[in-house]
Each structure stands twice: as structure tokens, then as C-alpha cells.
């Protein structure tokens, strides 16, 4: 079985798969990843004890050594780390392809494989990223603060505003401080991203799939219905990358 690690700034998604179509998934805190032995002991409860490949998409380079040690010790070989330069199925039309986050690379790889040569991908993580694929060429994108960053900025930058739990909220006007914050953040993100997507479409292409992914995309499912929600997009991208480098 192949074990995939999608390492984000806050959370890491771990998935076990044989063929890249069905995933057994566990989400853990990235901060909890300290040593290969602790990681193995924790994961074997959920996934068992045997892995033949370790494939990693990481935006936290200072813990990459843990996955390399994990792979060598428990899979008997080096880990495969996802990067743009090693994937030849897409043109990376940016100044420095090596600077593209591995999570964004995985999303674009899967978008091209599963949705076609054109796509707009929005990933709701610690930061929200928007990425553009045009004629199988990655044209760049946009990075904005994510939901949690906005909440923390309000909480830390003010004397009285509370740190709220972000959850769906109906309506456009809040009746208390917490609902004010929830409505403000959710509507700002939904309307802002909608406006950006429309501008991208107008400048590049009209008929293009718009794919929302990332764990926090679930927060806005009731607000934005004219898009595709694909929560396993990045995992499939990691697996497709693995297929390309071992073929």
C-alpha cells in the first residue's frame, strides 16, 4: 500500500491507497509530527504496519526529514517528494517553478488529469490559494489569508473582539459580535473570490470548471453552489505525481 502525506501549515492529511482511486484518510495536526517513530506508532493504529511507498506533498520543509526517515525505516526506500520541476505533463509558466507550493502543484496536476486542460482551483487552507490552468499551462495564481488567519488577526489586533469558531451563518447582518465576525469573514471571502474568478474568466476563458478544495471549503458550501467541490483533489494529484515519476 502507498501512504500519502499532504502536509499543510496547520493540518496534515494522511491517506492510504492502492490505486489512487480510493483513500483511507486520517487528518492529524502538523505540529504533532516530531519523529518518524512517533508518527509510525500513531498511524499503525489506523492504517496497519506495512507500506511500500511514501509520497509527500509538503509546504513545511523543516519537518521533511521526518518523512524521509519514516520512509527509509518503514518502507525501505527514500520518500518521493512532490515538486513542479519533476512533473512534465504541465508547463509551469511562472518565474520560479520551484517556489510553487507542493499543495498547489498537486491540485493542478489532478485538475488537469480529471477536469481537462483548463481549470481554476481554489484551495481553502491556512491560506486561500487560487490557481489558473490554461491549455495545460500553469499560469500562476493568487494567495490571500485564510479563514483562521482572518479570525486570529481580529482577535490579536483588537482589545475586545473574541476569537470565534467559524461556521456557516445565514443572513447578511449580524445581531451580536460573534455573528458580525462570522458574516463579515464568510461574505468577504465568498464575494471576493467570486469577483476574482469572474475577472479571471473574462480575461482568459468563459467556460472553465471552477474547483473548490481544502478542508475549510466545507464552510462555504451553502454559499457558493456554482462550483465543483472536490475534497480529495490534492490527494489524487499526489498519487498522479507518483505515477508519473515511477513510470
From Swiss-Prot:
It comes from the Bacteria. Substrate binds at residues 101-104, 177. GO terms for molecular function: ATP binding; metal ion binding; pantothenate kinase activity. ATP binds at residues 6-13, 126. K(+) binds at residue 123. It catalyses: (R)-pantothenate + ATP = (R)-4'-phosphopantothenate + ADP + H(+). GO terms for cellular component: cytoplasm. Its EC number is 2.7.1.33. Belongs to the type III pantothenate kinase family. This is Type III pantothenate kinase. It comes from Thermosipho melanesiensis (strain DSM 12029 / CIP 104789 / BI429). The gene is coaX.
